[in-house]
Amino acid sequence: MGVEPPKPKAEVILVPKNSPIQSVAQLKGHKVAFQKGSSAHNLLLRALQQAGLKFTDIQPTYLTPADARAAFQQGNVDAWAIWDPYYSAALLQGDVRVLKDGSDLKQTGSFYLAARPYAEKNGAFVLGVLDTFSQADALTLSQRQQSITLLAKTMGLQEPVIASYLDHRPPTTIVPVNASVAALQQQTADLFYDNRLVPKKIDIRQRIWQPTQQAGEKL
């Protein structure tokens, strides 16, 4: 029902600081940890494609963020594709290096989902919810220190981690999905299908709700 702007600095591929791996192309043959089906999985697929590699050129290690962090710290994997705040926590702990972020990978931002029958019956309310989320994000940025303190307490993380997390987030206005975002997400769906990660092709346009009362770009 809605989408955030991309946050290319908030998702990365990490390697140990002293790793000989200096480029995505050099991940060939190496173990890379990430959560299957996640945005980090998408980041990795796009980075490999950009570097001229196939998914089969690496050794994927499917792990939750907590387990991936442990495996990475213990040297059981060679690289780790991950998002914030896990990325910020690892970065501030030290001994890691960013191999690649999403700056030039044309990813979408996070999506907000709703049951289609509900959205179709309550379009005005859905738009109000998206606007409220956007206002909350603006408040988080305008009252930065209060937000850092509150989020650190709520998420159980140190304040410097939250500060880094916020630094990686551009201002976020959440809006209904338009044609350009749908096209980018279609690329992701096709990429997952081409790598046999989903069983059949997905037409993203059929999965997107648009408010009928809002004029705009058609999918």
Where are these regions (language model features)?
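Short, glycine-/small- and polar/acidic-enriched structural segments
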Residues: 1-54, 59-62, 78-81, 99, ...
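Phosphate-coordinating loops and pocket residues in cytosolic domains that bind phosphorylated ligands
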Residues: 29, 92, 209
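Pocket-lining segment of extracytoplasmic ligand-binding domains
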Residues: 60-61, 66-153
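Secondary-structure end/capping motifs
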Residues: 120-199
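Conserved C-terminal helix/tail region of periplasmic/extracytoplasmic solute-binding proteins
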Residues: 190-219
